[in-house]
Amino acid sequence: MSRTPRLPIGYTLAPMRDEDINQLAEWAAIEGWNPGRSDLAIARRIDPNAFIALRDGDQLVGGGTVFRITPSFGFMGLFIIRADRRGVGLGRALWHHRRDRLIDRLAPGATIGMDGVLDMVPFYNDGGFRLAHHDLRYQGVASGEHDPYVLALIDEDRTDIRRLDAALFGADRSAFIDAWLSAPGVQAVVIRSESQRVLALAAIRPALDGYKFGPVLAESPDLARRVVGHLLSMVEGQAVQIDVPEPNASGRALAESFGLSPVFRCARMYYGPTPKVNVQHVFGVTSFEFG
């Protein structure tokens, strides 16, 4: 595993202030990452210690997130250096410090997940991460069909949803998924069995540009198609994005059947043991930034 570079003289790492997080969101928007409008606020509320600022004196020049989801599972999320400070090694130093900070926040032998850009995979390998699979971002214009058997999520569904999310994410993140699905503007729908067990879940949220899906979890491709199609009908004509695990061929076919096109590929990687999850039931990941 590669050694952690030292920060140049005058640069420091510190917890982020609220105004820093707003600045991070603005930089992310400029880069075209199109975060959900409430994404960072939710993450801040669930794990306020996850946000790390890189400063030159008192000036914010970069930042990132390191989420402690459970003692045995963390996630390295948003990571950005201000455009005019790139190319001098700050990103390399910040990335390693984030990794080390998260390792310190977790139990020995814990797993850390991340989604990274493809041309940085060798760098992440040097940092101890190993590729699990690729994810594909699809985008297009929403066009779907109302399904009378697709119903709005209710409080009684949450126990099933927490269990489903934990099984398909690789860790129990009940507080996060509860907050995520209750955020302003989120529309979350389910299909239930006759015994009222949740068979499929899909959520869509307002982003800086249009809407983003996530998560989309289902026991079968047909159930996934129905919940996705229903939500698309609710935002008809709007720009939409959905991030699909590439090994899930049914998920890719589903996105393409609604006229969405692949525009971006990233690498899901893990440090430590790789979780045993069945991505064939994941038709849309929650977020590249938060897992």
Write out the residue ranges for each language-model feature.
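N-terminal, Lys/Arg-enriched amphipathic/low-complexity engagement segments
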Residues: P35, D39-L40
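An N-terminal domain-cap segment
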Residues: R44-F51
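Hydrophobic alpha-helical segments and helix pairs
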Residues: W95-D147
